[in-house]
Amino acid sequence: MRHWYDQAIIYQIYPKSFQDSNGDGIGDLNGIRKRIPYLKELGVNAVWLNPVFVSPQVDNGYDVSNYFAIDPKMGTMEDMDNLIKEMHGAGIHVIMDFVLNHTSDQHPWFQDAIKNPDSIYRDYYIFAGQNNQRPNNWGSFFGGSVWEKDPAETGQFYFHLFDKRMPDLNWKNPEVRHAMSEIAKYWLEKGIDGLRLDAFIHIAKADLRQNFPVNSKAEEPVVAEPFFANLPQVQKWMRPFCEEIKQDYPDALLLGEAASANVNLAVDYTNKDNHLMDSVITFRYFTEDQSQVDPSFSAQYQPKSLDLVKFKQNQAVWQQTLSGVSKPTLYWNNHDMARIATRIAKNDIQARSLAMLMYLQNGLPIIYYGEELGMKNLEFEDVTQFEDETVKEFIESAKKAGKTSQEALLMVSKTHKLPARGPMPWNNAKNKGFSDGKPWLKGKKVDHANAADEIADSHSMFNFYRKLISLKKEALFEDGGYYLLPTSNDSYVYERNLEDQKALVAVSL
């Protein structure tokens, strides 16, 4: 059975940064509606919206306090209904980002859990430990321990894999699994066409009594990823969730974020016999070249080039292993990493080459907003703009190694995910047409390229992407076989074939 998403070309919209319609400096749903003609001209047939639910915005919407309402900064439910209707009218499907591993600490479930020791919602989260002793030495992805003291002063702690204001849900509890399923079906009933399942690989945790073994005697928390990523229970709990959705909405796309999943796990997650997801987004494509890293200070935010040899190996493995199972996702950047024009491409020609290389392979393209204009990361002027303790630590480390504050700050601007979320440049008007007010995120450099100029220039990056997308829609590039040819390290050549058709895609890097 064919589904619409078998031919999907997805455009990722970071709503806060796409288009502001009311002058508050924050992009919103009505701003997105205004730009539907632009999306149609580009040629995409689906959009993925980063979270637009009610949120305190601790983590830019990934901390949800109400799944059944639109954040007032984004608009209203009526705006959302109109957006869905107008997108569909333009032949564009709508995919929503669904945060299902955790909620905001302001969510009514968590608030009740910490105010009432007998609350049924206490078991919606993971509380453990006693006598003010943490259960284990596991570390959070956002730094520090995964354990935060229970505000109710019970002597226990609650589990948070990300920010302490984003407590993890207890997926062992069938009531939690049912509640999340009901939320998903609510939005699908409203007319959306699919869900990106955020951080689903983390919903299962190992035995909380188990410390992660380390060589050091230090008591610093350690990111014990094997204990909370891709555990077998993930599939056990996600299967009924996915089956229920597919039973009621058989044409809904379920796109899982499986950041650390290897290709064999991707097969498990997307094999149709397993009744799970249709495709997954992995972060395993991009192996960085560590050879130029300065060993005298932290490597975390030092710019690193792409290891092209390992990239080719990774692509060949993912293409061949998933062949006949599911379509891989094809992308160069998203909201969790620096932009391709900053991170990898050395110039405009290389950016185009990389786009062609990636998107004409077998799979589902996901184009990050502004990528089609050659957008780069913003350059921040102050460390406080990052709101990230790891950045402060990196800059101090770099300064001790002889770097100036500005040199270190520039490194972080080129590698951190936040500067990749800058406002979309639409034209040459105030704030590049993004907003009449002060944009929520600014840097000292703004891209010279803007959508209006790019559309008017037949040789622009935008028009290159438009032609590339049109080419991708041909059956040969949608459904054809794939074979990566052996070539030198600085070239990337593959063949696509379908019946009597054949194409050779050759890129010099």
Report the location of each language-model feature.
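Short, solvent-exposed loop/turn segments at secondary-structure boundaries
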Residues: G23-I26, T342-A345, E381
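Loop/helix patches that line or flank the sugar-binding groove of alpha-linked glycan CAZymes
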Residues: Y5, S216-A218, P226, K236-M238, ...
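Residue-level marker for buried hydrophobic side chains located in beta-strands
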Residues: V94, L195, Y368-Y369, V505
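Flexible loop/turn segments at secondary-structure boundaries
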Residues: S55-P56, H102-S104, S145, R196, ...
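Acidic/aromatic-lined carbohydrate-recognition and catalytic surfaces
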Residues: R2-K185, E189, H202-V263, K272, ...
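Hydrophobic residues within beta-strands of alpha/beta enzymes
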Residues: V47, L195-L197
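Active-site-adjacent bridging/hinge elements
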Residues: G155-F159, S326-I344
